[in-house]
Amino acid sequence: MKRKLQHLWICFAMFLFLAVPFNVKAETETTPVSISVKYGQTEARTILDMINEARTDSNYAWYWNKDDTTKTYCENLQPLQYDYDLERAAMQRAAEIAVIYDHRRPDDRDTFTVYGENSVTSYTRMGENIAAGYETAASVNYGWREDDEPYGGQGHRRNMLS
Protein backbone atom coordinates (compact mmCIF):
# COMPACT_ATOMS: atom_id res chain seq x y z
CA MET A 1 0.00 0.00 0.00
CA LYS A 2 2.80 2.37 0.93
CA ARG A 3 4.53 1.65 -2.41
CA LYS A 4 1.31 2.38 -4.35
CA LEU A 5 0.99 5.68 -2.48
CA GLN A 6 4.57 6.59 -3.45
CA HIS A 7 3.86 5.84 -7.13
CA LEU A 8 0.66 7.83 -6.97
CA TRP A 9 2.50 10.77 -5.37
CA ILE A 10 5.25 10.64 -8.02
CA CYS A 11 2.66 10.53 -10.82
CA PHE A 12 0.82 13.48 -9.27
CA ALA A 13 4.06 15.47 -8.95
CA MET A 14 4.96 14.73 -12.58
CA PHE A 15 1.48 15.73 -13.72
CA LEU A 16 1.69 18.94 -11.71
CA PHE A 17 5.13 19.68 -13.16
CA LEU A 18 3.90 19.13 -16.73
CA ALA A 19 0.59 20.93 -16.26
CA VAL A 20 1.92 24.13 -14.71
CA PRO A 21 2.76 26.66 -17.43
CA PHE A 22 6.17 28.25 -17.35
CA ASN A 23 7.01 31.70 -18.59
CA VAL A 24 10.18 31.55 -20.62
CA LYS A 25 11.82 34.88 -21.29
CA ALA A 26 14.71 35.68 -23.56
CA GLU A 27 17.87 36.98 -22.01
CA THR A 28 17.67 40.76 -21.78
CA GLU A 29 21.40 41.29 -21.92
CA THR A 30 23.39 40.98 -25.10
CA THR A 31 26.48 38.91 -25.61
CA PRO A 32 29.19 40.39 -27.81
CA VAL A 33 30.43 38.09 -30.54
CA SER A 34 33.42 38.34 -32.81
CA ILE A 35 33.06 37.08 -36.35
CA SER A 36 35.24 37.05 -39.42
CA VAL A 37 33.43 37.66 -42.69
CA LYS A 38 34.36 37.67 -46.35
CA TYR A 39 32.27 40.11 -48.34
CA GLY A 40 31.20 39.44 -51.92
CA GLN A 41 31.35 42.92 -53.44
CA THR A 42 31.82 41.43 -56.91
CA GLU A 43 28.63 39.41 -56.48
CA ALA A 44 26.79 42.45 -55.10
CA ARG A 45 27.77 44.50 -58.13
CA THR A 46 26.76 41.64 -60.43
CA ILE A 47 23.33 41.55 -58.79
CA LEU A 48 23.06 45.34 -59.18
CA ASP A 49 23.74 44.94 -62.91
CA MET A 50 21.08 42.21 -63.12
CA ILE A 51 18.55 44.39 -61.28
CA ASN A 52 19.27 47.33 -63.58
CA GLU A 53 18.85 45.06 -66.60
CA ALA A 54 15.48 43.91 -65.27
CA ARG A 55 14.36 47.46 -64.47
CA THR A 56 14.68 48.38 -68.17
CA ASP A 57 13.17 45.15 -69.55
CA SER A 58 9.44 45.51 -70.23
CA ASN A 59 9.07 41.71 -69.97
CA TYR A 60 10.29 41.87 -66.37
CA ALA A 61 9.49 45.35 -65.05
CA TRP A 62 6.04 44.55 -63.70
CA TYR A 63 4.40 43.16 -60.57
CA TRP A 64 0.94 41.86 -59.77
CA ASN A 65 -1.63 44.23 -58.30
CA LYS A 66 -3.22 43.25 -55.00
CA ASP A 67 -6.09 41.61 -56.93
CA ASP A 68 -3.56 39.17 -58.48
CA THR A 69 -5.25 39.48 -61.87
CA THR A 70 -3.75 42.65 -63.32
CA LYS A 71 -0.16 43.77 -63.63
CA THR A 72 1.39 47.12 -62.86
CA TYR A 73 4.08 47.91 -65.40
CA CYS A 74 7.02 50.03 -64.27
CA GLU A 75 8.01 52.30 -67.12
CA ASN A 76 10.98 54.62 -67.51
CA LEU A 77 12.83 53.29 -64.47
CA GLN A 78 16.29 54.74 -64.06
CA PRO A 79 19.23 52.44 -63.29
CA LEU A 80 20.16 52.21 -59.63
CA GLN A 81 23.53 53.79 -58.86
CA TYR A 82 26.20 52.12 -56.76
CA ASP A 83 26.70 54.01 -53.52
CA TYR A 84 29.72 53.37 -51.29
CA ASP A 85 27.96 54.48 -48.09
CA LEU A 86 25.13 52.07 -48.90
CA GLU A 87 27.72 49.37 -49.62
CA ARG A 88 29.18 49.91 -46.14
CA ALA A 89 25.67 49.66 -44.62
CA ALA A 90 25.02 46.48 -46.64
CA MET A 91 28.30 44.97 -45.46
CA GLN A 92 27.31 45.75 -41.86
CA ARG A 93 23.94 44.06 -42.41
CA ALA A 94 25.64 41.05 -44.05
CA ALA A 95 27.76 40.56 -40.93
CA GLU A 96 24.68 40.93 -38.71
CA ILE A 97 22.71 38.46 -40.82
CA ALA A 98 25.55 35.97 -40.35
CA VAL A 99 24.75 36.19 -36.62
CA ILE A 100 20.95 36.18 -36.93
CA TYR A 101 19.12 35.76 -40.24
CA ASP A 102 16.34 38.30 -39.84
CA HIS A 103 15.07 41.62 -41.12
CA ARG A 104 15.79 43.01 -37.65
CA ARG A 105 19.22 43.74 -36.30
CA PRO A 106 20.75 41.38 -33.69
CA ASP A 107 20.02 43.93 -30.95
CA ASP A 108 16.38 43.97 -32.17
CA ARG A 109 16.56 47.46 -33.64
CA ASP A 110 14.90 48.23 -36.95
CA THR A 111 16.93 47.16 -39.97
CA PHE A 112 17.07 50.65 -41.42
CA THR A 113 18.86 52.19 -38.44
CA VAL A 114 22.01 50.95 -40.19
CA TYR A 115 21.54 53.71 -42.80
CA GLY A 116 22.15 56.60 -40.42
CA GLU A 117 25.12 54.81 -38.88
CA ASN A 118 26.74 54.67 -42.33
CA SER A 119 25.91 58.17 -43.60
CA VAL A 120 23.19 56.95 -45.98
CA THR A 121 20.89 59.96 -46.05
CA SER A 122 19.76 60.43 -49.65
CA TYR A 123 16.96 57.99 -50.46
CA THR A 124 13.28 58.08 -51.34
CA ARG A 125 12.43 54.46 -50.49
CA MET A 126 14.08 51.72 -48.50
CA GLY A 127 13.87 47.98 -48.69
CA GLU A 128 16.01 45.00 -47.78
CA ASN A 129 16.41 41.82 -49.79
CA ILE A 130 18.41 39.15 -47.99
CA ALA A 131 19.28 35.65 -49.14
CA ALA A 132 20.99 32.54 -47.83
CA GLY A 133 21.89 29.18 -49.32
CA TYR A 134 22.27 30.28 -52.93
CA GLU A 135 25.34 29.29 -54.95
CA THR A 136 25.54 32.23 -57.36
CA ALA A 137 24.52 35.86 -57.78
CA ALA A 138 22.27 34.77 -60.65
CA SER A 139 20.40 32.28 -58.48
CA VAL A 140 19.88 34.93 -55.78
CA ASN A 141 18.59 37.37 -58.38
CA TYR A 142 16.27 34.73 -59.84
CA GLY A 143 14.93 33.91 -56.37
CA TRP A 144 14.19 37.58 -55.71
CA ARG A 145 12.40 37.95 -59.06
CA GLU A 146 9.42 35.94 -57.78
CA ASP A 147 8.06 35.58 -61.32
CA ASP A 148 5.41 33.02 -60.39
CA GLU A 149 4.35 34.52 -57.08
CA PRO A 150 1.14 36.47 -56.39
CA TYR A 151 1.26 40.07 -55.15
CA GLY A 152 1.81 38.98 -51.54
CA GLY A 153 4.88 37.00 -52.53
CA GLN A 154 6.49 39.66 -54.71
CA GLY A 155 7.97 41.92 -52.03
CA HIS A 156 11.54 41.39 -53.25
CA ARG A 157 10.47 42.09 -56.82
CA ARG A 158 8.70 45.32 -55.82
CA ASN A 159 11.82 46.37 -53.86
CA MET A 160 13.93 45.96 -56.98
CA LEU A 161 11.45 47.90 -59.11
CA SER A 162 10.83 50.77 -56.71
List each language-model region with its residue ranges.
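A well-ordered secondary-structure block
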Residues: E96, D110-S162
